[in-house]
């Protein structure tokens, strides 16, 4: 059974990002994956303190609500990270999450816990899904150090409409199929 960890980086509990993440999670669950779902805006967690304690051990020493999720990421087969685009970037809690992934790499910048797929989900107000491609690629440049193999993006355009994702049948199918592919180990193949 594949284990998948999903992070929702949207403050809206019923918005486009969550709609897509829920479909990815459902596609994975329907194909026998175990899915752990975390909503960052509901969690109390600190940003990385750059204390470098994780260089001496394999864990972050900060004992907060993110700790359990980070432990699951270490053994997961796949990670899904979703965020709306605010001010041309991911939300602050998602950036803090990426910083807290620092213990996933060793002192030489190599992954400590093996390879796993990562799927990213974004919602944006702009209608061109390629507007932020360079930002997505820039963000993905850090993935190899974490042991993440980028399985691609799912982007919901026109997200100022809170029901954009729900009305886009093609996007919904793509999200469900992405979850299925993560569960079956065929994502990004």
Describe the predicted segments one by one.
Residues 9, 30, 140-189:
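Glycine-rich phosphate/pyrophosphate-binding loop and the adjoining helix
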């Amino acid at each position: 059974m594949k284990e998948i960890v999903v992070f929702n980086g949207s403050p809206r509990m019923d918005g486009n990002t969550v709609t897509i993440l829920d479909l990815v999670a459902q596609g994975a669950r329907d194909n026998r994956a175990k899915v752990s779902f975390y909503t960052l805006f509901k969690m109390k967690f600190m940003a990385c303190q750059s204390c470098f304690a994780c260089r001496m051990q394999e864990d972050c020493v900060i004992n907060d609500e993110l700790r359990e999720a980070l432990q699951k990421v270490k053994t997961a087969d796949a990670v899904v990270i979703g965020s709306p685009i605010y001010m041309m970037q991911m939300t602050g809690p998602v950036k803090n999450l990426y910083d807290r992934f620092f213990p996933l790499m060793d002192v030489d910048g190599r992954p400590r816990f093996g390879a796993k797929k990562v799927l990213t989900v974004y919602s944006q107000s702009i209608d061109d899904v390629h507007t932020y491609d360079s930002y997505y690629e820039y963000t993905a440049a850090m993935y190899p150090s974490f042991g993440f193999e980028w399985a691609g993006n799912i982007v919901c355009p026109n997200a100022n409409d809170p029901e954009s994702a729900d009305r886009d049948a093609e996007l919904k199918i793509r999200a469900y199929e992405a979850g299925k592919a993560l569960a079956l180990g065929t994502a990004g193949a």
